[in-house]
Amino acid sequence: AFYPILIGLGAVGYMLWKDFDIQVFSGITFSWHMVFWLVMAVVFMFGRDIGYIIRIRILSNNQLSWRQAFRVIMLWEFTSAITPSAVGGTSVAIIYVHKEGISVGRSSAIVMLTSFLDELYFIVMFPLLILIVGPSELFDVSTSSGVLTRSLMGIALTGYFLKLGFVLVLSYGLFVNPRGLKWLLLKVFKLKFLRRWYHAAGQTGTDIIRSSHEIRRYNYKFWLKACSSTFLSWSSRYLVANALIMAFFAVSDQFLLFARQLVIW
């Protein structure tokens, strides 16, 4: 797991060295305020990965050790960073978890649950932040007209309801009728323009059935811990940008910064 870290640090170091411009830094006045928020950005980065590590241990019922969980998350993050967003690290995460001695069925369940919890975080947080910040503030751009603001709101709501639909369908498959969802997937992907992904849809349906058998055994304490670690990881991820902006600019509305990042995601 240390090789991906070294490769990543080496690549970042090279890009910083290549693009370094002393003239840019000459206009920055360093202060204890800046140092504090830069340190906080690093703390939030650690919080993000610690949340992921805690969560994957919880999802494995502590079958993964801390070291194994760290290794899986580092490989997962590295894969997500170097692959196209359409692929991401999720497609190979099952392999990483399985390599640590967990069965394929349980590995599928763990990875499926991480996706479910990630989407659930957005589904819950988006309306809460809309209530706190207000839609007019969230989508207002100083140079925009009312038409553009409404268009941005429409795009965000479309994305939200698509994610909500995904979560509802996945919830139905995981908790209610996994075989029925697999049957529906196969029917949909028999359509001519979707037929090329028919076998992949069948595999997804099989993964959902395997995952469902695992998930139905979990109690409310498990879900509370899993949701708490998800909240820690994703909130820390967004707060990194908040801290970096606070280091260089005077910003009063932290919720607005946080909410706009969530909408972009």
Regions found by a protein language model. Give the residues of each.
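Predominantly cytoplasmic-facing regulatory/coupling regions of multi-pass membrane proteins
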Residues: A1-M74, V141-W265
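Transmembrane helix boundary and interhelical junction motifs in multipass membrane proteins
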Residues: R48-I56, S85-I94
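Helix-loop junctions at the membrane interface of multi-pass solute transporters
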Residues: R57-N61, A81, A93-I102, F231
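Membrane-interface alpha-helices at helix entry/exit sites of multi-pass transporters
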Residues: R67-V72, S85, G89-T90, E100-F116
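Membrane-embedded alpha-helical segments of transport systems
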Residues: L75, T79-T83, R106-L131, F161-G165
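Transmembrane alpha-helix termini and helix-breaking/packing motifs in multi-pass membrane transporters
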Residues: F126-T143
